[in-house]
A protein has these predicted regions:
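Low-complexity "stalk/linker" and mucin-like segments enriched in Ser/Thr/Pro/Ala/Gly
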Residues: 32-38, 68-84
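Exposed beta-strand face motif in extracellular beta-rich ectodomains
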Residues: 48, 96-102
Length: 126
């Protein structure tokens, strides 16, 4: 009987603690931009500070990967691997009614992956 209890006690410690996915608390969106229906409008060439606030319940290190859709015309991120890069607005798409979306993939290194999407961004020509 004692052996079974000892083995049961050892076995209980073998199960890893479940990982919690990161959670986006704010963003991704241009810092200070109002919540407006239909999207946000920025003049081409404007440098925008992006806002993103993330929490990981397990206090895992969090990694970021920013991208833009559609990829062309390409805006410029100051870095695609930090939480709050700047992004320079590209020239307008051929169809001025085509929105641009910024995406951020947030990963905690323990298979917790989350993707955030900005509001629609429309480019105003200079």
């Amino acid at each position: 009987m004692f052996v079974l209890l000892a083995l049961g006690g050892l076995g209980a410690g073998c199960y890893p603690t479940p990982n919690h996915m990161p959670v986006i608390l704010k963003g991704p969106r241009p810092l200070g931009s109002p919540s407006t229906p239909g999207g946000l409008k920025f003049e081409e060439g404007t440098e925008i500070q992006l806002q993103l606030e993330v929490k990981d319940q397990d206090n895992d290190e969090v990694f970021f990967r920013w991208s833009q859709v559609p990829a062309e015309p390409a805006g410029a991120f100051s870095s695609t691997t930090v939480a709050t890069p700047t992004w320079t607005v590209p020239s307008p798409p051929e169809d001025p009614n085509t929105p641009i979306y910024l995406y951020v993939e947030v990963e905690d290194g323990n298979d917790g992956i989350l993707i955030g999407q900005s509001p629609a961004i429309f480019v105003i020509p200079k």
